[in-house]
Swiss-Prot record:
One Pfam assignment: Tape_meas_lam_C
Protein name: Tape measure protein
Biological role stated in the UniProt entry: Serves as a ruler that controls the length of tail by stopping the tail tube polymerization and is probably released from the tail shaft during infection to facilitate DNA translocation into the host cell. Assembles into a multimeric linear form possibly stabilized by the covering tail assembly proteins G and GT. Its C-terminus fixes the tail tip complex (J, I, L, K), thereby forming the tail assembly initiator complex. Tail tube proteins polymerize around tape measure protein, displacing the tail assembly protein G and GT.
PTM summary: Cleaved into mature protein H* by an unidentified protease.
GO CC list: virus tail
Comp. bias regions, Low complexity: 376-387
Species, as recorded: Escherichia phage lambda (Bacteriophage lambda)
Highest taxon, organism lineage: Viruses
Length: 853
């Protein structure tokens, strides 16, 4: 309205007609202004009347009512903030409800005031203001997450080996596991401040701590501090945790102690963290199971508000490097799909096509940047963990070096250093004289105590007592083992080494207790006996674990045997299946082998391919050998040649059979049974002939091979003659030889120089015996020339004689049985005849000399 009035003032002129018109306009404007003012005054009056009426109904003054209404939005904001922070709804109701009640002067005035003041527009405006403030606060809180993580890492020296991005990832993991981001990040920060290390386990630890703290109401810092003690000393830390929270057992502590004593610090820390985490999870579960209906409803309400506020806080929280990479990949994929869809579209102009390409390139560059960021973050996480491990190791060895230095200091050096320290403090006025005197006296007393020689133990255990105690302890140990074996006689029952150690310790303590009743114990024995209960308790725990380990090893061994047996059966079934399909045994065996190899190397495809390739090469070589008939011939001949040239074994066997035959025939002759010297002699001669023929055949084949080789080399004639001579020598042709089979007019055999061959008719006419007598002394080939007399022939046959035995047996037996004298006579005669025959056949031309074949 002011603007028209201003225009009116400016437009006034001295024209009367126009002046009247302008005055009319002024009146209309002022009348409108008056009406507007009256309306405004009426609204204000009505508002004041309503406020006065509401204040009157509430029983308070208008000023008190206005002050209470001004404070109401701020109190609503406090209620929303406290609910989001995880406080109990009942506690918030008591706090904020009491403040609202006090603002209105009581419960009834409060409800009357709220009923009169809360209108729909006011509720909307208030809700909008509260929502805006909450969003602004949430954005600020979420945006400061990384800053808070960095502060925590810096102030803790980053002993956990984490980065802010890694802490953000772990908090997101807790949020995905059902916790809120704030709960997980709070417990994670507390663990980092407590010095908890072990990046692989800190995720599960932080979630367990958050759940336990939420369910029990115990402060997160106290639980995190308990985990921090595990990092310093797993055994003592776990013991302290058991005393404070009662969530781990003595068996778990003993197992951790065993690992730590064996030098496995990392394994001990991991086992301690796992035991503590499991213990807190069990306690959390029991707490929730034992909640009443009201507590359960309150817990669900609180978790609902926490989840709602946590979702609001996500607005300002930064993304992790991995989340940024995922979003960048999605954005690039979307831009690339749009470009591929629009680049060849006829209805898209060049400007739009260029814009689509620019969007794709921007998305690609953003993706590359996100990938580099993710790689850098991964490397930073590794470097942080490595730096943490290095720093922890340095700190550990620094502490050990300091302790070692203190141990290496002599008492005098320690006393001198303490004196200098106290004197300097007194000189600088940093210590009171009375305190100086007390500390100096204590240092002097400690030094003087080190100068006193410790008294030697006056009790000495004799060698006999020690030997007796040792034998007694061994006896008790074996008795305990025997009792256990009698109780557990199953095939799968095994006794662990830890159980045997327990028996040994129990036996030693039993012997010490018995010895204490009959003699005085040494200081060492008293010390052992004083720690009996603790030692045996640890031994029992170790024995129980050792039995479990032994039993599990047995189960594992049986499982491996079962797997091996199953593999064998599958291979057999594969062979059976192959035979059922009509394959040969060799093919079935190959399929079974393939099945065994697949079962054995199935987990490693590369190794399976290698062994299958080598096996197939072997099968190919076997198939090639099976088709090579020449190789079979050579192999058969080589084996037969080895057997034929093994003269020692053959002659040994022949000699054994010969002497056995002589003994059997002699026994048969002496006992009156039927004996067959002819068959025996024939079998002996057959064996000897077979041996000689085998050797001759080997020689012939070898000579023929040499002859063929010589012929190929150009010396066929000479080599052929050499081969024939060698063959003749093998068949003893130097002594006359065999002319071979065939007709009368067919060429056969070989005749030496100076020899001749009898025809078949002449041989029959002269007689074989006479011919042999003619050949005695002439290498069985006969002498070609003027024949000599029979006497000459006999004289030339040296060492040859014929014997005719006339035996007359006078049997002096009774009842038709041969008598002793007759038996002896027959035995002597047979013995003499056998000796003479053997001597004859061993001469030139005899059967044993190679002649007479």
């Amino acid at each position: 309205m002011a603007e028209p009035v201003g225009d009116l003032v400016v437009d006034l002129s001295l024209d009367a007609a126009r002046f009247d018109e302008q005055m009319a306009r002024v009146r209309r404007h002022f009348s409108g202004t008056e009406s507007d003012a009256k309306k405004t005054a009426a609204v204000v009056e009505q508002s004041l009347s309503r406020q006065a009426l509401a204040a009157q109904k509430a029983g308070i003054s208008v000023g008190q009512y206005k002050a209470a209404m001004r404070m109401l939005p701020a109190q609503f904001t406090d209620v929303a903030t406290q609910l989001a922070g995880g406080q109990s709804p009942w506690l918030i109701l008591l706090q904020q409800g009491g403040q609202v009640k006090d603002s209105f002067g009581g419960m009834i005035p409060m409800f009357r005031g709220l009923a009169g003041a809360i209108t729909l527009p006011m509720v909307g405006a208030t809700s909008l203001a509260v929502a805006t403030g909450a969003l602004a606060y949430a954005w600020y809180q979420g945006n400061s997450t990384l800053s808070d993580f960095n502060k925590t890492l810096v102030l803790s020296g980053n002993q956990a080996g984490l980065t802010a991005d890694r802490m953000l990832v772990l908090s997101r993991a807790g949020q995905a596991a059902g916790l809120t981001f704030n709960q997980t990040s709070e417990s994670l920060s507390a663990l980092v401040k407590a010095g908890v290390s072990g990046e692989a386990q800190i995720a599960s630890i932080s979630q367990s701590v958050a759940r336990f703290s939420s369910a029990s109401g115990v402060e997160v810092d106290k639980v995190a501090e308990a985990f921090g003690k595990l990092t310093t000393d797993p055994t003592s830390g776990l013991t302290a945790m058991a005393r404070q929270f009662h969530n781990v057992s003595a068996e778990q502590i003993a197992y951790v102690a065993q690992l730590q004593r064996s030098g496995d610090e990392a394994g001990a820390l991991q086992a301690a963290n796992e035991a503590a985490t499991k213990g807190f999870d069990d306690q959390t579960r029991r707490l929730k199971e034992n909640m009443g209906t009201l507590e359960t409803w309150a817990d669900r309400t609180a978790r609902a508000f926490k989840s709602m506020w946590d979702a609001v806080l996500d607005i300002g929280r930064p993304d992790t490097a991995q989340e940024m990479l995922i979003k960048a990949e999605a954005a690039y994929k979307k831009a690339d799909d749009i470009w591929n869809l629009r680049k060849d579209d006829y209805f898209v102009n060049d400007e739009a096509r260029a814009r689509y390409w620019d969007d794709r390139e921007k998305a690609r560059l953003a993706l590359e940047a996100a990938r580099k960021k993710a790689e850098q973050q991964t490397q930073q996480d590794k470097n942080a963990q490595q730096q943490s491990d290095t720093e922890a190791s340095r700190l550990k060895y620094t502490e050990e070096a300091q302790k070692a230095y203190e141990r290496l200091q002599t008492p005098l050096e320690k006393y001198t250093a303490r004196q200098e320290e106290l004197n300097k403090a007194l000189k600088d006025g940093k210590i009171l004289q009375a305190d100086y005197n007390t500390l100096m006296a204590a240092a002097k007393k400690d030094y003087e105590a080190t100068l006193k020689k410790p008294k030697q133990s006056s009790v000495k255990v004799s060698a006999g007592d020690r030997q007796e105690d040792s034998a007694h302890a061994a006896l008790l140990t074996l008795q305990a083992e025997l009792r256990t074996l009698e109780k557990h006689a199953g095939a799968n029952e095994k006794i662990s080494q830890q159980r045997r150690d327990l028996w040994k310790a129990e036996s030693q303590f039993a012997v010490l207790e018995e010895a204490a009743q009959r003699r005085q114990l040494s200081a060492q024995e008293k010390s052992l006996l004083a720690h009996k209960d603790e030692t045996l308790e640890y031994k029992r725990q170790l024995a129980a674990l050792g039995d479990k380990v032994t039993y599990q090893e047995r189960l594992n061994a049986l499982a491996q045997q079962a797997d091996k047996f199953a593999q064998q059966q599958r291979a057999k079934r594969a062979a059976i299946d192959a035979k059922s399909r009509g394959l040969t045994d060799r093919q079935a065996e190959r399929e079974a082998t393939e099945q065994r190899l697949k079962e054995q190397y199935g987990d490693n495809p590369l190794a399976l391919n290698n062994v299958m390739s080598e096996q197939k090469k072997t099968w190919a070589a076997e198939d090639q050998l099976r088709g090579n008939w020449m190789a079979g011939l050579k192999s058969g001949w080589s084996e037969w040649e080895e057997s034929a040239t093994d003269s020692m074994s053959q002659v040994k066997s022949a000699a054994t059979q010969t002497f056995d035959g002589i003994a059997q025939n002699m026994a048969a002759m002496l006992t009156g049974s039927e004996q067959n010297w002819r068959s025996f002699t024939r079998s002996v001669l057959s064996m000897m002939t077979e041996i000689l023929l085998k050797q001759a055949m080997v020689g012939i084949v070898g000579s023929i091979g040499s002859a063929i080789g010589g012929a190929v080399g150009g010396g066929a004639s000479a080599s052929g003659g050499t081969a024939i001579q060698a063959a003749a020598a093998k068949f003893h042709f130097a002594t006359g030889g065999f002319t071979g089979t065939g007709g009368k007019y067919e060429p056969a055999g070989i005749v030496h120089r100076g020899e001749f061959v009898f025809t078949k008719e002449a041989t029959s006419r002269i007689g074989v015996g006479n011919l042999y007598r003619l050949m005695r002394g002439y290498a069985t080939g006969g002498y070609v020339g003027t024949p000599g007399s029979m006497a000459d022939s006999r004289s030339q046959a040296s060492g040859t004689f014929e014997q005719n035995n006339h035996v007359v047996i006078n049997n002096d037996g009774t009842n038709g049985q041969i008598g002793p004298a007759a038996l002896k006579a027959v035995y002597d005669m047979a013995r003499k005849g056998a000796r003479d025959e053997i001597q004859t056949q061993m001469r030139d031309g005899g059967l044993f000399s190679g002649g007479g074949r």
